Amino acid sequence: QELGYLGVLANYIREKRHGDHTFFNRNFHIEPTNVCVYDCKFCSYSRLIKERAEGWEMEVDGMMDIVKKYDNEAVTEVHITGGVVPKQNLEFYADFFRKCKAHRPELHIKGLTPVEYYYIFKKAKLSHYDGLKYLQSCGLDSMPGGGAEIFHPEVREQIAHDKCTAEQWLDIHEQAHKLGMHTNATMLYGHIEQFWHRVDHMERLRQLQDK
């Protein structure tokens, strides 16, 4: 009931700002790897580095093979997100974005979450802004909202203790906005969090929107 009421309020604001318009797209998903340096408590499919024999780590050519499978379909977007591994670094994704745009320029690239970017940019010794600007020049168009989970440290420390912090997650999105990129956000709820943790999460997102 509370969620439904929240949806009514959200729709009121949406209609006030955008009128009676709704956006749909046709996308496909590429998950470059299910191997991950992080050990989130809720993740049931990823494999740690020490378990990588049970997982997969794609190369750029393999990712492009997936893109090419959709050559004769009216897709509008490729959505890329997965685990975090050292070999899939800044230049790995720069190479893929370039090749993807060269092959199909009109295809919108919604790529990677702040969790991946925080790790990649730290390894590359780049600021969030400079890293995103570089990848934007390679073809990145927008950013998905995964990895937000629950922002409050009381919960985040228990379920995803080694991921980027809420502040780092929000800053990466803020830098993307400064570059003119659109982003979205998620919230993982229904586990150990309380209602006020959800409110805190959405309030932080609203504050970022207000900026």
Describe the predicted segments one by one:
Residues 64-83:
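Short Fe-S-cluster ligation motifs
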Residues 78-103, 120-124, 193-197:
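Conserved glycine-rich "GG(E/T)P / GGGxP" loop and the immediately following alpha-helix
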Residues 49-50, 79, 84-87, 114-121, ...:
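Conserved radical SAM core fold
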Residues 104, 137-148, 167-211:
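Conserved C-terminal portion of the radical SAM core fold
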Residues 1-23:
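An N-cap/entry alpha-helix motif that binds or orients negatively charged groups
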Residues 16-62:
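Canonical Radical SAM [4Fe-4S] cluster-binding loop centered on the CxxxCxxC motif
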Residues 64-67, 93-98, 132, 170-173, ...:
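Generic structural signal for well-ordered alpha-helices
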Residues 53-65, 90-91, 126-129, 166-167, ...:
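Glycine-rich anion/phosphate-binding loops
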